[in-house]
Amino acid sequence: MAQLYFYYSAMNAGKSTTLLQSAFNYQERGMEPVILTAAIDDRAGVGKVSSRIGLQADAHIFDENKDVFALIQSLNQDKKRHCVLVDECQFLSKEQVMQLTDVVDELGIPVLCYGLRNDFRGELFTGSQYLLAWADKLVELKTVCHCGRKANHVLRTDENGDAIADGNQVEIGGNNRYESVCRKHYKAALNMGR
């Protein structure tokens, strides 16, 4: 029975690596996955899912206007699709999350979404908010803070490495702009303690 999965974490937990491994597992068995990624994330090139360890795959892109149900339905009519893998799912809209529930419920195709739970301000991304509410399975992928604790927050830093508390929710970047930290060090970096 198909289900909607949300694999979430802070940055550098291996979300894209896990997605690419899942795609490989399906392909190795002669099955056809659909890989989607956010158009806004062009760090490896538009329409590419790439991991820090060098794995990469082509992907269909989505932006805020893409009807992901229609895309997957069309692809499935051309050739049977066995799963949908969504990278950078935090950038999905509420409507797109609901469309993915329709992919599961109406088309019977499992959907595995991978993304950040919260932004650098400690607030949920829209896609993550609705995946937390609507996913059948929630799976936390873990990474570690510099202190060894589980990192569950992301700090955005400026060119001097100082934490930033304000700004646009979305600013594409990697290790040069973001650091995954535990709650204690997140609060300390932003002077949020007592």
UniProtKB/Swiss-Prot annotation:
Molecular-function GO term, any one: zinc ion binding
Residues binding Zn(2+): C145, C147, C182, H185
InterPro entries reported in the protein's UniProt record: P-loop_NTPase (IPR027417), Thymidine_kinase (IPR001267)
Domain of life according to the entry: Bacteria
Binding site for ATP: S9, A10, M11, N12, A13, G14, K15, S16, D87, E88, C89, Q90
Gene3D superfamilies: 3.30.60.20, P-loop containing nucleotide triphosphate hydrolases
Classification via SUPFAM superfamilies: Glucocorticoid receptor-like (DNA-binding domain), P-loop containing nucleoside triphosphate hydrolases
Main localisation: cytoplasm
Main EC class the enzyme belongs to: transferase
GO CC terms, sorted: cytosol
Record: active site: E88 (proton acceptor)
Subcellular locations according to the entry: Cytoplasm
EC number of this enzyme: 2.7.1.21
Reaction(s) catalysed by this chain's protein: thymidine + ATP = dTMP + ADP + H(+)
Complex formation: Homotetramer.
Assigned protein family: Belongs to the thymidine kinase family.
Protein name, entry field: Thymidine kinase
Annotated source species: Pseudoalteromonas translucida (strain TAC 125)
